[in-house]
Amino acid sequence: MKKVLALVLAVIMLMAVAAAETVNTKETIKVGVVQLVDMADSDSAYEGMLATIAEAGLSDKIIVERQSAAGDAGTMTTIIQGFVDGGYDLIVPVLTPPAQAAVNICGGEIPIIFMSVVDPVYSKIMPDWNTVSPDFLATGTSNTIPADLMIETANDITPIAEGEKIFIMYNTSQNNAQCTMEAAAAYCDSMGYAYDVVGYTDVPDSVTQANALDPDEYAYVYVALDSVIAANFNQLGETLTEMGIPVYGVADAMTKGGALCSYGVDYTIVGNMTGEMIVEWYNGTALEDMPCRRYSEFSLVINSDVQAALGIELPEDYAAQATYVTTVRAN
């Protein structure tokens, strides 16, 4: 009987420790921010996060250290492990790859509030949008642009004629690209829109795939989220525009690079949202009581150079709300 009682007490103690890990009890905490690459959007999100912490009067209580891996996955892993070994109380990975790495390295030992992850469920960071896994202790903010929003916008601006299809392109090596491609394809299936899907491996391959298109067969091209091509969109954008095929992206960087249209995200607000979650956790809210929070204040972005080249006239409601940009060439 004593052995059984001891076992029960041990289990209760373990459960208490596990529960305590999701709730902050310290007056001062160390927060490690990790990002794989240096990007203007990440800078904006980081500054927004710090501003929210400062507005809460907690800049001297929530001590933040930010490190970048400069594009090297091995360095990113080392940074996260350093946060673990250094006794950090909370890790904030920026974007999907660092978030995936953080949950695998931390294994539920350190709470994680990720920032700007496209789909934490698809990426196996959370079991669903509202549930924190005890194995990962991760929640945070998402910047995903709904597939129905982008596709219906494309249909309104460049209607699908009889016999035409949508051409969906995605980077086969990027989790976010696969995720947004599948969401777009599923939405097209649900609406009965005809479409084709093709994968590419890099920017030159995307141009090769585009050159093989028949302009009379497709109403437009939809490019799934891809940080590589978003930063180097000029070649693909120019190729499709010269062919007379409108191309829609899911990041405003794509529009600045030569896509006709996308929806933009204010990453300062994403940072504010993440900062709010950090403040709430610091003040005692359990991690499991904080579902993933989704950004929803999307703004329409139109490339006026591409619009003019294609001779497209925007519907009045879109023209009234759009932010216009011109093509920016990558260095």
Model regions and ranges:
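Short beta-strand elements in bilobed, periplasmic/extracellular small-molecule ligand-binding domains
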Residues: 56-76, 137-138, 187-203
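Hinge/cleft segment of the Venus flytrap/periplasmic-binding protein
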Residues: 280-331
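Pocket-lining segment of extracytoplasmic ligand-binding domains
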Residues: 175-245, 251
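Short, low-complexity disordered leader/linker segments with a strong preference
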Residues: 1-29, 85, 331
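Beta-alpha junction/loop-to-helix N-cap segments that form part of ligand/metal-binding clefts
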Residues: 65-129, 226-241, 245-250
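Extracytoplasmic "Venus flytrap"
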Residues: 25-51, 56, 65-75, 226-231, ...
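Hydrophobic alpha-helical segments within soluble ligand-binding/sensing domains
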Residues: 24, 120-165, 265-285
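An alpha-beta-alpha
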Residues: 31, 49, 139-191, 291-308
